[in-house]
């Protein structure tokens, strides 16, 4: 997404880039077109590089699949990396990163997919340590975030959250109430 970096330097907002087809949905489209094997090899190269630089532990998040198959693909790659390399690797399920285009008019249906399809399979295959949600206007509301976090906790995942990147809508409080390990972004207080 190099062009998006240039767009940010030139003054476009994250929301303007997303509205032009960039951002998370752009990455999701590319990820879903990539095979699990190719994704593993791409990720392996990056992992080798950070290990050579002295990194002792990494967290790798999903969140760019936004489909059952795409999210599971990412998490399976992370699990395979963790089993093949001596570095500590923690996996975070971030299926609630954005709403896929298919669900733009039925957001609750996507939340049902996360809770009833993704989370059970993630738990069954032991694919993640944490659950993360992007709680922000235009993404996941406070109520939706709370519902997803609660479901993740039921499956043994420790919560993390992305909040207050553009607006303060109450996400920090949900993180505190649910003992989130971290609340990230915090660009707007």
Give the predicted meaning of each segment:
Residues 54, 127, 178-182:
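Short loop/turn motifs at secondary-structure junctions
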Residues 25-44, 48-49, 56-170:
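Metal-coordinating catalytic core of metallo-dependent amide/deamination hydrolases
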Residues 158-159, 167-189:
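Active-site-adjacent C-terminal substructures of enzyme catalytic domains
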Residues 3-4, 147-148, 177:
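Glycine-rich, phosphate-binding/catalytic loops in enzymes
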Residues 1-42:
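Metal-associated gating/positioning segment near the N- to mid-region
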């Amino acid at each position: 997404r190099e062009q998006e970096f240039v767009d940010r330097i030139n003054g476009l907002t994250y929301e303007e880039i997303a509205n032009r087809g960039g951002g998370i949905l752009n990455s999701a489209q590319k990820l879903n077109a990539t095979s699990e094997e190719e994704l593993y090899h791409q990720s392996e190269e990056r992992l080798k590089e950070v290990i050579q630089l002295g990194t002792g532990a990494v967290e790798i998040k999903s969140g760019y699949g936004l489909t059952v198959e795409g999210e599971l693909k990412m998490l399976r790659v992370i699990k395979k990396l963790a089993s093949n390399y001596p570095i500590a690797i923690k996996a975070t399920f971030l299926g609630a990163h954005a709403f896929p285009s298919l669900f733009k008019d039925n957001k609750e249906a996507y939340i049902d997919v996360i809770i009833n399809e993704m989370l059970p399979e993630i738990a069954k295959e032991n694919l993640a340590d944490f659950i993360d949600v992007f709680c922000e206007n235009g993404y996941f509301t406070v109520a939706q975030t709370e519902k997803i976090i609660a479901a993740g906790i039921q499956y043994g995942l420790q919560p993390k959250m992305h909040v207050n990147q553009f607006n303060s809508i109450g996400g920090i409080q949900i993180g505190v109430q649910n003992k989130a390990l971290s609340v990230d972004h915090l660009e707007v207080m």
